[in-house]
Amino acid sequence: MSLLCPLLLALALVAVPGAHGNCPVPADLKKSDGTRTCARLYEKSDPYYDNCCQGPVLSVEPGTDLPYLPSGWSNTASSLVVGQRCEITVWSLPGKHGKTRKFTAGSYPRLEEYRKGIFGDWSDSISALYCKCY
């Protein structure tokens, strides 16, 4: 019985579709000319991981400092992918005010899974950002 539980757990984890759904892996954030993108913000996420990282995309270059996001992007990002050897710092209010959080290289298909204080989450909460790569 003790061997059966870990075996069933391993089987269940393998059977689950990719935890990152349709989100690109951080290594894929490169342009055709070889330069890299620091991060991509996506407007749509979904309870199903396979439907995340869709809709309009905001690509952020290394060194981008946006205390105010472009028109239509404030408080709309629901999924996020950060490139290899990069990190993005986000703020909940324009002008780099409010709550803050750093996301390192990786795929974050559902920002509602990341807490912002006691009652909030980061889905539709990003109003400012700074992205850098090493």
Curated annotation (Swiss-Prot):
| InterPro entries on file | Syncollin (IPR028137)
Which range is the signal sequence, renumbered to this chain?
1-21
- Output the superkingdom of the source species: Eukaryota
Kindly list the places in or outside the cell where this protein is found, as annotated in its UniProt entry: Zymogen granule membrane; Zymogen granule lumen
- Chief subcellular location equals membrane
Posttranslational modification, per the record? Contains intrachain disulfide bonds.
The alphabetical list of record keywords is: Cytoplasmic vesicle, Disulfide bond, Exocytosis, Membrane, Signal
Q: What is this protein called?
A: Syncollin
